[in-house]
């Protein structure tokens, strides 16, 4: 089990200790680390809604280091990012693969960033089915609908054509931060905090 660091803050009322993620949440920073799954998505959605209630005019920063995960869990985060009033800036630290890359590109245009050595990977959604032939056919139709929708959204976010994104996501497509910028998935590669507009 990972140890989560604690930070101690001095206030007029004495000392207060926070786990590091709670302290950063006060600065409107949310971490999306690890596999995107339902529990994680619920926590991130709750944090987005909380920060919107705190100040609907102030940007929220979503730091992403993820190998991807469950499409529907990622879409819950994506839809909430677009539903709330504050702009959600995205920043890739480490990797943003699959659904992680989709969420990275789904940040507010002009506020999508990656650190210099970050890696981004896009591909078509993965799935598997078993059971009766009819059930497998239903699952196949659903994954094809998701593939079409994700491709369309990624084309909108990147400025690429639907056909190009469809071709580029046929297999795992790895990119450096600079390549992700050139593709349109992010707006800027950051080398220092001062570069965040």
Swiss-Prot record:
The keyword Hydrolase applies. InterPro entries: ClpP (IPR001907), ClpP/crotonase-like_dom_sf (IPR029045), ClpP/TepA (IPR023562), ClpP_His_AS (IPR033135). The active site is at 98 (nucleophile), 123. It catalyses: Hydrolysis of proteins to small peptides in the presence of ATP and magnesium. alpha-casein is the usual test substrate. In the absence of ATP, only oligopeptides shorter than five residues are hydrolyzed (such as succinyl-Leu-Tyr-|-NHMec, and Leu-Tyr-Leu-|-Tyr-Trp, in which cleavage of the -Tyr-|-Leu- and -Tyr-|-Trp bonds also occurs). It holds the Pfam family CLP_protease. Its EC number is 3.4.21.92. It is found in: Cytoplasm. CDD domains: S14_ClpP_2. One of its GO terms (molecular function) is ATPase binding. GO terms for biological process: protein quality control for misfolded or incompletely synthesized proteins. Keywords: Cytoplasm, Hydrolase, Protease, Serine protease. GO terms for cellular component: cytoplasm; endopeptidase Clp complex. Fourteen ClpP subunits assemble into 2 heptameric rings which stack back to back to give a disk-like structure with a central cavity, resembling the structure of eukaryotic proteasomes. Belongs to the peptidase S14 family. This is ATP-dependent Clp protease proteolytic subunit. It comes from Haemophilus ducreyi (strain 35000HP / ATCC 700724).
């Amino acid at each position: 089990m990972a140890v989560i660091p604690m930070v101690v803050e001095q206030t007029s009322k004495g000392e207060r200790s926070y786990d590091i993620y709670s302290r950063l949440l006060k600065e409107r920073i949310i971490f999306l680390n690890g596999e995107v799954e339902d529990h994680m998505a619920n926590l991130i959605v709750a944090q987005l809604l909380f920060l919107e209630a705190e100040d609907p005019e102030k940007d929220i920063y979503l730091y992403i280091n993820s190998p991807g995960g469950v499409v529907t869990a990622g879409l819950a985060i994506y839809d909430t990012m677009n539903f709330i009033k504050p702009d959600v800036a995205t920043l890739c630290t480490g990797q943003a693969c699959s659904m992680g890359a989709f969420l990275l590109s789904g940040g507010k245009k002009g506020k999508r960033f990656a650190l210099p050595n970050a890696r981004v990977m896009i591909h078509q959604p993965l799935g598997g089915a078993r059971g009766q032939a009819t059930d497998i056919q239903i699952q196949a139709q659903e994954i094809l609908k998701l593939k079409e929708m994700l491709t369309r959204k990624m084309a909108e976010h990147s400025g690429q054509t639907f056909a190009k994104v469809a071709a580029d996501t046929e297999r795992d497509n790895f990119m450096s931060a600079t390549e992700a910028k050139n593709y349109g998935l992010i707006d800027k590669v950051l080398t220092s905090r001062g570069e965040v507009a």
